[in-house]
Amino acid sequence: MTKPIEGVVIGFDFGLKRIGVAIGQTITRTATPEAIVASKDGKPDWEHISRLFEEWKPSAIVVGLPMRLNGEEQALTQPARKFGQRLSGRYQRPVYYIEEQLSSIEAEQRKTKTDQPMDDHAAQIILENWLDAL
């Protein structure tokens, strides 16, 4: 993996209804949950995403790729990859992919409120795993 420009990195947990977003820092190698972006049939709220890019000015993008436990692709793998390509094209930043096996389960275990969506926490876990691999 080529190390991106140091600074802020934005991470995504892609879903057809919701997209979790986390913000990370390559210097401290930490990430925090930031937002849950609405998505309708896989079409993200690009205005919301643009506001996040304007606010945080990330140097790179990380997208979790949903994979089966045996490492094979599943139904959401290609849509997540396409989402990453669209992000890179729109915002002119390098995109990095990381397998996101079990990130939603880990996010569920971490969260404190049981009635809240955890997509942003799943994005945090994805981003933390990517930062740990730098």
UniProtKB/Swiss-Prot annotation:
Keywords: Cytoplasm, Hydrolase, Nuclease, Ribosome biogenesis. One of its GO terms (biological process) is rRNA 5'-end processing. CDD domains: YqgF. GO terms for molecular function: nuclease activity. The keyword Nuclease applies. Its EC number is 3.1.-.-. It is found in: Cytoplasm. The keyword Cytoplasm applies. Signal peptide: none annotated. Belongs to the YqgF nuclease family. This is Putative pre-16S rRNA nuclease.
